Amino acid sequence: MYAVDCYGHGGSLHDALKYNVVDMGNAVIYFIQNVVKEPVCLLGHSSGGLIAAYVASHSDSCSTLVLEDAPFFSCQDERRKHSFNYVDLSTVCHAFLNQNEETDFVLYYFSHQRIWELFSEKSKEKLHSKLTASAARYRKKHPDKNLRVPFWPKAGLAAYQGMNHYDPRFGEAFYTDSFHAEIAHEDLLRGIRCKTLFLKARTEIGQDGLLMATLDEEDLRHVLNLVPTCSLIRFDCGHAIHIEKPKAFVSALCTYDIGQRKEM
C-alpha cells in the first residue's frame, strides 16, 4: 500500500504552478510506472478523486478505481461558485493569500470558515471570540498537531487533519478554476475503462440553494452514465467518509464487488 501526498499537501512539492489535474495526474502515473511497476487499485478522496480519474483515463496504470466523494461537475466553471467548497475553503484561501496580518493558515481558516454564518447573530460573536481564542491557544501550544477545539464537532475537526502541511495556494486553484487545466470532467470520466466504485456521502442543499456537498444527485447520475463500469455505495455522513465512517469505509473496499452496477 502506498499513501501519496499530492502536490500542496503533506511532504510533497509545494509549487503552485503544479496545482492542476494534469501535472498531478502525470506525477501519479510516473510514480506507479516507476515505483510500483504494476497496475494498482487507486483511491482518491475529494479532489484526489479528480486526479485519480485523470490517471485512470490517461494510462493503463489503474486496474481498479475508487472515487471517494469526488466533486465532479460541481467544482468546475461557474457552477463552482454555488458550492460550499468555493464559498468556504477556496474563498478563505484566496482571502488569506491577500492579507498579511495572520501567518497561521489553520487559525485563519478556523476564524473565517463559512460555518460561522450558520450560528445565530445572538450567539455567533461570543462563540466566535471564545472558540477562536481557544484554537489560538492550542495552536501556540501544539503547532505541529491537528487542531482540537473544545465543543467543536468531531466531523468539523476532520477538515483540519493534515492542514498544517496544506498550501492555501492549492485552494486558490479552485477559486480561480485553474486546477482543471481546461479539461471537462465529462472527458475525464469517459476515458475510464477499469472497474470503478463511487463512494457517495450525504447530499444536502442549503436554504439559499448552496450545495452543501461535493456533488448533487444529478451530478452522481451523470458520473454513473459516463462510466458504465462504475458501481455505487452511499454513506450517511459528511464528506470525509474514511474519517467519519472508518469501519464501513474499509468494509466497502474489502467486500464490495467493484464494477457490478448497483441500482440507485
Locate each region found by the language model.
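Hydrophobic, aromatic-rich cap/lid helix
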Residues: E125-D187, T203
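Flexible "cap/lid" loop of the alpha/beta hydrolase fold
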Residues: V66-R114, L118-S123
